[in-house]
Amino acid sequence: MAMRAKDALGRFGEEVASRHLAAGGAAILDRNWRCREGELDLVLRDGADLVFCEVKTRSGTRFGSAAEAVVGRKAARIRRLAARWLAEHPHAPSSVRFDVVLVSRPPVGPVRVEHLRGAF
């Protein structure tokens, strides 16, 4: 089955984000972790922090910025999923952080990556 363009763009963004975070010293613990309530894009360790990272990828501004997509219900859902992940992976981190990585892939020009630490 062919991958939909939206799914392919999302996978591209997650790969770019993973490489960006790893280059900054983070250790990727989980990618696309799923349970019946949903999916966490990335779970990583950044120093002493356990980080739950939502990746948003856009090819334009038609649907607003990627940062605007992670508010309210979406942020609350990610927090619930993080609690579920922690229940299944008792790491006892010293701190937990919620980040967003914004990947912009314009039709022309280079890919841009913006890492919002402690976004919500």
Curated annotation (Swiss-Prot):
GO molecular function, one term: nucleic acid binding
Listed InterPro entries: Restrct_endonuc-II-like, tRNA_endonuc-like_dom_sf, UPF0102_YraN-like
UniProt-listed Pfam families: UPF0102 (PF02021)
Gene3D superfamilies named among the record's database cross-references: 3.40.1350.10
SUPFAM superfamilies: Restriction endonuclease-like
Coiled coil regions in record: none
Family: Belongs to the UPF0102 family.
Name this polypeptide is given: UPF0102 protein FRAAL5785
Source organism: Frankia alni (strain DSM 45986 / CECT 9034 / ACN14a)
